[in-house]
Amino acid sequence: MSYVPGIGRAPFRRRGEESPVSARIKIILGAVAYIAAFHWAYATILARSYDYEGFKFRDDAAIISVTWLLALVPSFWMPSRLTRPSQLAYWFFYLVIVVPVAVVTIHSYPGDAHSGILTAVLIVSAFAVLGLIYAVPPAAIPHHRFQPHGLWLAVLLVSTLSYGLIFSVFGIRFNFGSLSDIYAIRAEYKTIVENTSVYISYAVDWQALVLNPLLIILGLISRRKLLVALGAVGQFMIYSFTGYRTVFFSTILLLVLFLLCRSRDRFGIRVLLVLTGAVAGATALYLWFGSLFLGSLIVERLIGLPGLLTGFYFSFFGDHAKMTLSHSILRGIID
């Protein structure tokens, strides 16, 4: 919040600028709405339709109160407006990691609820410590801007290399199966990757998770439709042989994110309301029409699974040796 000091009088806010108290109240109320919507979706969709994956519901008032408390506490310090790029990631951590951990991990932790609560407390505490960085003014570091032609040359070279590896194995194809066939497509992709070089999977991941999204977001910012089209076509092609729905819907997600970031002063409440509406809409769609299409994409995959897998991870590696990076290309050094 910026203020203009006056001589001999108190500082005042710019006209139309929201007060810190008002902005904080909106963030807290938005968080309450989001947590309530996710609790509703969890009890209605995840604990019923996806119980075979490990989603459980502990019908205990004390446990439910703890989930509410741990999920809501971070809203008291979450940034209401974007002033640093990293705050976008910080909000992402809160919405799809901290809240799911506070709810799902406690309900579904293997064994007793106490271990799940302890895990959630540790995660929320670590998240709070991470947020302390925003209390420190940014250091005056000299910026060496990357020249545009250098950026495009780097993107072109890396994309050419990764697409060359991808085309050598999968060819150029746009065979879109139905969303119900993705598991067969994924199984085929996994088999191919296991029988080829590990660098193929790295090339696919870099193109799908870094380079194509970079083209899309740069195209949106600069209003260059060709860049958006190139990135989107690349994502659809990669989806056609991987079956990863995250890749398929990434273009839409980036567009929504771009629209949310256009108003950085109200980013916090906007992203809370958008995700609350998405979760509530997915739950209503399931109750009214029995469809799990949005429930699977938003409630289970995007929000629910991070909380579930966090509990599984802590439970398993609490009693077993850590893998570190022994599954990666560094296995020769780690093993």
Predicted regions and their residues:
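Helix-loop-helix junctions and helix-breaking kinks within/between transmembrane helices
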Residues: 104-119, 233-259
